[in-house]
Curated annotation (Swiss-Prot):
Source species of the chain: Salinispora arenicola (strain CNS-205)
GO BP of this protein: translation
Protein name (Swiss-Prot/TrEMBL): Glutamyl-tRNA(Gln) amidotransferase subunit A
Subunit comment: Heterotrimer of A, B and C subunits.
PANTHER family linked to this entry: GLUTAMYL-TRNA(GLN) AMIDOTRANSFERASE SUBUNIT A, TRANSAMIDASE
Keyword vocabulary terms for this entry: ATP-binding, Ligase, Nucleotide-binding, Protein biosynthesis
Entry-linked InterPro entries: Amidase, Amidase_CS, Amidase_dom, AS_sf, GatA
Signal peptide: none
């Protein structure tokens, strides 16, 4: 009998639609897998067993009644614990939100339910999406299924690790500086940051509002495209949502899977193809570029000179926005409250709550952001960073006048051991060196497995113009079809 957890989302949806397997059977298989391996991986913070089975049985009832099913009906999905889920704990990986059960679903979750997917639960993450290793979660680190002594990337390491451990065929993440793509790269899975505004932020616990982008994670490019199609599109509840339809990413993925890139012009980012990455990562990337050429793509070198300033600009813009966004967590309305013994002032209670509720990385970024926005320093730091952001956007605009898409390694290194970089924030921040530019620009990016280095996965990143997400899906699917899947060791 076929192991249901080994199948793609598209394959599982087909089984359910044809009646060859029930949604309940598919869901139970994945719940059993979570029970079997998640004590070692720790991808999930909360598993909604009864809710998942109820949703699966509802899909089976619809099929039995002859109702039409969507392309992902009956397929399990895991959701990063940064998106609100009605009645289900949402912590953003922080002690300050421990036990909070939101009264509403985020738009992404609402669309997942409407598509007939089955939500298994919430996945682990760096606190408030601030981190690159999922070691900054208040509830303990997640481990990489390729090597349990190593990190799964971050901030959305739980969503990526759950895929690599075959606990779910689909998951949802959020990407502020690389938090979907970087975990995808180091776990050998597919991670997508859609165009900013192409997926709704309504119900997303905010880190950096001008950068945060929810997106799909999967084991195949087609599965990611199907999930992207389900969650994308305009949402009037999000003022930054783009009033335009989702590009036809599913058709693009299917076209790319044919392995034909004739007529596609790709640019290798010169500044990201040399120094700054491990030799094994560069070797795998260069081999993948050779493969893209063999598939018919024309590959040229493109210079984006201001990309080198993206990392410092990001670490002024994002902390500045987070220092404002996180001011709402004060212990007054919801979540953790400390020191409310009747003998302290409201200000003292708020201070004690934040001291106990926020972890060290969150505190570091809030302090940095508060300083950058302070009187006398705003123009020198935040203002200058926004000017750099404009220059990076111009680099992208100029590049896309020459090529259809840009390619680079997704991350400079493979998964490193748990604990290896927590004492050095700068080394941790370098994990997002290649992914941050797309966030500052607002365009889409996808990470697709392209090879191995030292037995660990390496990802290739494809970046496209805003609202041209279909371009990157075509390129990623073509590469995937040529290099094949990369399967982690059995757990």
């Amino acid at each position: 009998m076929t192991d249901l957890t080994s199948l793609s989302a598209a394959e599982l949806a087909g089984l359910v639609a044809r009646g060859e397997s029930s949604a309940a059977e598919v869901t139970q298989a994945h719940l059993d897998r979570i029970t079997a391996v998640d004590d070692r991986v720790h991808a999930f913070l909360h598993v909604d067993t009864e809710g998942a089975l109820d949703a699966a049985r509802a899909v089976d009832a619809r099929r039995a009644a002859g109702e039409p099913l969507g392309p992902l009906a009956g397929v399990p999905v895991a959701v990063k614990d940064v998106l609100t889920t009605k009645g289900i704990p949402t912590t953003a990986g922080s002690r300050i939100l421990a036990g909070w059960r939101p009264p509403y679903d985020s738009t992404i979750v609402r669309r997942l339910r409407a598509a007939g997917t089955v939500m298994l639960g919430k996945t682990n993450m760096d606190e408030f999406a601030m981190g690159s290793s999922t070691e900054y979660s208040a509830f303990g680190p997640t481990h990489n299924p390729w090597d349990l002594s190593r990190i799964p990337g971050g901030s959305g390491g739980g969503s990526a690790a759950a895929l690599a451990a075959y606990e779910t065929p689909l998951s949802i993440g959020s990407d502020t500086g690389g938090s979907i793509r970087q975990p995808g790269a180091v776990t050998g899975t597919v991670g997508v940051k859609p165009t900013y505004g192409g997926t709704s932020r309504y119900g997303l616990v905010a880190f950096s509002s001008s950068l945060d982008t929810p997106g799909p994670c999967a084991r195949t490019v087609l599965d990611a495209a199907l999930l992207h199609e389900a969650i994308g599109g305009h949402d009037p509840s999000d003022s930054t949502s783009i009033p335009a339809p989702v590009p036809d990413v599913v058709a693009a993925a299917r076209l790319g899977a044919s392995g034909d890139l004739a007529g596609v012009r790709l640019g290798v980012v010169r500044e990201f193809a040399g120094e700054g990455a491990e030799p094994g990562v560069l070797a795998a990337f260069r081999a993948a570029v050779d493969t893209l050429t063999k598939l018919g793509a024309e590959v040229v070198e493109v210079s984006c000179p201001h990309f080198q300033y993206a990392l410092p600009a990001y670490y002024l813009i994002a902390p500045s926005e987070c220092s404002s966004n996180l001011a709402r967590f004060d212990g007054v309305r919801f979540g953790l409250r400390v020191g409310d013994d009747g003998n302290r002032s409201l200000e003292e209670v708020m201070s004690a709550t934040r001291e106990a509720g926020f972890g060290p990385e969150v505190k570091r970024r809030v302090v940095l952001g508060t300083y950058a926005l302070s009187s006398g320093y705003y123009d020198a730091y935040y203002g200058q960073a926004q000017k750099v952001r404009t220059l990076i956007t111009r680099d992208f605009t100029t590049a896309f006048e020459q090529v259809d898409a840009l390619v680079s390694p997704t991350t400079p290194f493979v998964a490193f051991p748990v604990g290896a970089r927590t004492a050095d924030p700068y080394q941790m921040y370098l994990a997002d060196l290649f992914t941050i530019p797309s966030n500052l620009y607002g365009g889409p990016g996808i990470s697709v497995p392209c090879g191995l280095a030292d037995g660990l996965p390496v990802g290739l990143q494809v970046m496209a113009p805003t609202m041209a997400d279909d371009r990157m899906y075509r390129v990623a699917a073509a590469l995937e079809s040529a290099v094949g899947p990369f399967t982690p060791p059995a757990l």
